[in-house]
């Protein structure tokens, strides 16, 4: 019994060494209550005392003595032995964990800022000190931002207002150019509105307007259907030679089958268009194919449905723009200037001085299909005649 209190006396301060057994008995009720609470919270209390290798950090002598003393204490529950386990638990929570994260106590951490010789006992104090070296970035009071333009003396309190002001000096270099008057317009919507006015002033008093519509490529895409004198687009043979030779007009019972009249017109009303051949260059085949793909416009027979072929000239006036040149679709005239082509188209109008000028003469009355009868033989030899031979 005399050797038992020697074990815990190593963990106690120097003032507790001369204490007698009576003082231990006087403190025993309080320590007993603490021991009970610790045993309720941590059930493996005796096992904690049986793990002495953690105390090898304190030194070889202290580790051997502490490791030897708790071995007999694990089986005893005396009041004097409760101080040993509590000291070991407090030692593991205070000394073991901090040694991995913090420097040993008493070591000062110097400031890493240049010119600063201060040192601090903890990392938290050092972090608070570093804030004095790195203040948050803020604009100085009274600082003004000046515009960099040469003739501008505006100043602004912040950068956001300066950037918004800079847009007034550096607008995007974008514009939409009118093809008729070469006017530069800022927005695309304004270009549409301008094309209506520009087309009305550019065209002549004639009813059919030759200038383009709203789209830039509309002259080549919309006008060819009106100038097309060929039969219905369902036939494959006009694609081979659309304008070089007159379109054939079959006679007899084959006319209703070969010309289904997709625009609601009877075959006799289509004969003026089949007989009249404009005769422009063969380079317009691409325009004809493009109009076929887009679907024939119902306005194609306009001007020639109830009128003779001579009055159908306004609907046949078209031009083609390829490789920077404008080519007339009724004659061999070509130019690189749009106004020159517009003036040339006035000659093909019915009221113009040279209305019958283009290539081949046009008949004034609906042509008789009899002269075209010999031309129907090559068409019938390509497979059309055997189909309708029983009829």
UniProtKB/Swiss-Prot annotation:
Residues 214-226 have a biased composition (Basic and acidic residues). InterPro entries: ZN414 (IPR039882), Znf-C2H2_ribbon (IPR031799), Znf_C2H2_type (IPR013087). The keyword Ligase does not apply. GO terms for cellular component: nucleus. It is found in: Nucleus. Keywords: DNA-binding, Metal-binding, Nucleus, Repeat, Transcription, Transcription regulation, Zinc, Zinc-finger. This is Zinc finger protein 414. It comes from Bos taurus. The gene is ZNF414.
